[in-house]
Amino acid sequence: MYPKLEDLLAFMPKEKGIRLVSLQYGVDDERLAKEHGNSIKLETIKDLDQVNDLEGVAALISSLDLVVSASTTVLHLSCALGVTTISTYYPNFRSSRGGDPLFMNCYPMLAGNEIFSSEKVAERTGKTVQNFIREEK
């Protein structure tokens, strides 16, 4: 189960200077623009083959301050690269501090006993992104 993109975008901070880069391959920029207007610009790196160029994807992820991802290759690669990562899914493992003990830079938005809700995950993700931005200033 994945949160809906429109739910995630609704809770993302709207501050100037924030760039959202899509790490999802096959994204249709024109469709996204029509569906979401100019409220938030979701950028794609058109020259990057996100299916066959894993080194390029790793380089892109390494250049980001924060990654938000469902449980996909992007999530696991981001965590392995040491990039601060918000998981919109349940943790694979969980420590008593709430994080993933294998990847201390990965923050799951759901506890193992919670029922998945796209809006709940999106709201928590937005708050976590906002906290990250505040701490980075």
Where do the language-model regions lie?
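Nucleotide-sugar donor-binding patch of glycosyltransferase catalytic domains
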Residues: 34-42, 47, 76-135
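Donor-binding and catalytic core of enzymes assembling or modifying cell-surface/extracellular glycoconjugates
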Residues: 4-87
